[in-house]
Amino acid sequence: MTQHKLNKAYETFSKVISLDPNWAEGWNKRATVLYMLGRHEESQEDINEVLKLEKRHFGALSGQGLVQIELKNYERAINSYKEVQKIYPSMQSPKIMIPQLKELIKSESI
């Protein structure tokens, strides 16, 4: 997706949020766009809003894992993926990411 399209998507989801701030998916979609724009702290802020509205939103929790990886908060990323596993045990990304993150933490501590 081009930078222009991402910026347009950001504007659109910001308007959606202003119209209905209680719709978790509006926050989640904007969090995704912010992640794609490399605005990871802002993405996490929107994920926090999603989880206030819907604490079992596995998409937001999975996205939080990705954001926390970018912010180098690997333990927090692992915790996010563990929460996803509780809600959606058959989702594959936590099964892949948790071992990789544990290995990364181990290699960085050497």
Set out the residue ranges of the language-model regions.
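Canonical positions in the second alpha-helix
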Residues: K15-V16, E49-V50, E83-V84
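Register position in tetratricopeptide repeats
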Residues: T2, M36-L37, E70, Q100-S107
